[in-house]
Amino acid sequence: MNNFRQCALCIGTSVLILLVSGCSGVFDTPEDSKETQIKKSFAKTLDMYPIKNLEDLYDKEGYRDGEFKKDDKGMWTIYTDFAKSNKSDELDDEGMVLNLDRNTRTAKGYYFVKKFYEKDKFSDRKNYKVEMKNNKIILLDKVNDPNLKERIENFKFFGQYANFKDLENYNNGDVSINWNVPSYDVEYKMSNKDENVKQLRSRYNIPTDKAPMLKMHIDGDLKGSSVGYKRLEIDFSKEDRDISVIDYLSYKPAKK
């Protein structure tokens, strides 16, 4: 089932590919372990959490490289999804992506509802256009389902309530590296007493008492890049049932 989740993510979010790239600053010394370097790479973004008012991002600049034009203030993209398998061969996935253009100070995106099938059937996907004004999500498409309409209009990104100020206290993670990409992964066992875990359990139907894993993944330069990507996942999966939350916050050029 975990392979199913991996495949579904690759197919369903290949364009968005779950980024958390953007910020960079004081980085590692030669003595830092790869685990420490990965945490430092994430920290400059996660230190911004919680972003209670997303419009604050209009006044924040992320990591800039040669991909940016001089007159481009850049664009933040924030993303959260919640995926849960309800049957052995089906995975339901809902979430939102919002692009905040610092040049125009406008925010547009969409809420998505997806269902993936493991065998002999194409995935189903429906997108509902949204925009944000005065830190409020405004639904632009007609939605007949009142429950779905409410979920969209009241949606909160993980980055709006998450807090990783104690990230440096996560230690002894399981680290893996693929030098060919390069890509870097580290996993930590979380506690059900963790405030981030409590927040997720209060917002989503998570039918397990199992303490989740925090998974951090980076493709590309550890020191920062507008080309590579990072992914943060809190995985509650058990046995043959996938349950996880994906989050990213990225900073990319707005002008091509």
Swiss-Prot record:
Pfam families: DUF576
Disulphide bridges: none
Keywords assigned by UniProt, alphabetized: Cell membrane, Lipoprotein, Membrane, Palmitate, Signal
First and last residue of the signal peptide: 1-22
N-palmitoyl cysteine lipid attachment residues: C23
Protein name, entry field: Uncharacterized lipoprotein SAB0393
Major localisation: membrane
Gene3D superfamilies on file: 2.50.20.40
Taxonomy, superkingdom: Bacteria
Subcellular location: Cell membrane
Family membership: Belongs to the staphylococcal tandem lipoprotein family.
Membrane topology of the entry: Lipid-anchor
